[in-house]
Amino acid sequence: MGDWSALGKLLDKVQAYSTAGGKVWLSVLFIFRILLLGTAVESAWGDEQSAFRCNTQQPGCENVCYDKSFPISHVRFWVLQIIFVSVPTLLYLAHVFYVMRKEEKLNKKEEELKVAQTDGVNVEMHLKQIEIKKFKYGIEEHGKVKMRGGLLRTYIISILFKSVFEVAFLLIQWYIYGFSLSAVYTCKRDPCPHQVDCFLSRPTEKTIFIIFMLVVSLVSLALNIIELFYVFFKGVKDRVKGKSDPYHATTGPLSPSKDCGSPKYAYFNGCSSPTAPLSPMSPPGYKLVTGDRNNSSCRNYNKQASEQNWANYSAEQNRMGQAGSTISNSHAQPFDFPDDNQNSKKLATGHELQPLAIVDQRPSSRASSRASSRPRPDDLEI
């Protein structure tokens, strides 16, 4: 037999990307098929045709009788069987190499984007797209490849083809020469002058090897079926768990929120620009419409911006209070604002709020003046 080292090295690489059932199947293939075929089986069938004798002296009769009894040698038949059942596994290995090549490209691109991010370039959306692609290809941290998506489908298809090839070769072997060998074969074929008897060398030993290879084929077929069910239920389980995965819900296009695009208010609420011009004061009873607090891009809060907002608001109310105007308390409500580190560094550290002096032009009555001079339990001590 030829050298099996090349095929063995390729199949050995599949071990790292197979399930437990796949690893057992590869072990059976290596030990009980390739190793046994290259050592014991080849020596048993080495003198196959030379030891095939017929009770005639007619030239060419033994050759035609041997060709009729054994259209293909058992050893070559098993070699073809090993090659065919290994091809789907090699195709799956090619898909794994393709995913690993994709991983190298994505990692290289991710490093370039991170370098650009240190220079102040906004690359968050591109980095998010790379993470989604890695999840799609089944790439995890530390170079580990997980069976997911197209890789999982390729693995299932490879198991199906291996099972089909196992069944097909078992049927072909049974159709050609069965699962046992006889000591005597009767042949009546030209150029034999009459019906002749041909004798096979070591039929019992060869029958034992045939039965052994049959059992190994059945074990491999059973492992393929078990692995197929295991991968199927594992895929269903991952699909159910995938609903809670952070990447599972990322199906829409990655685009920034449109709510934060237009600067409408001078205060730093959730959807306003810190550099927007001051808007005129609202009339009494008007409620300031702030941004959507549930927006994921407007959830973070900045302490310094909050203090600056209230300082601006206090200054405006003081000016309006000195002019004799009153402002409804409904205007004083908290604001939402984004967590912008660059803008927060430029803002002041905040000011203490001064109480608003509300001027009332009407003269106070005696009752009200007496009531106002009495201390009340809810009065504040200054």
Curated annotation (Swiss-Prot):
Residues 317-382 are annotated as: Disordered. Residues 45-76, 177-207 are extracellular. Residues 244-382 are annotated as: Interaction with NOV. The modification Phosphotyrosine is found at Y247. Gene3D superfamilies: Connexin43, Gap junction channel protein cysteine-rich domain. A connexon is composed of a hexamer of connexins. Interacts with SGSM3. Interacts with RIC1/CIP150. Interacts with CNST and CSNK1D. Interacts (via C-terminus) with TJP1. Interacts (via C-terminus) with SRC (via SH3 domain). Interacts (not ubiquitinated) with UBQLN4 (via UBA domain). Interacts with NOV. Interacts with TMEM65. Interacts with ANK3/ANKG and PKP2. This is Gap junction alpha-1 protein. The gene is GJA1.
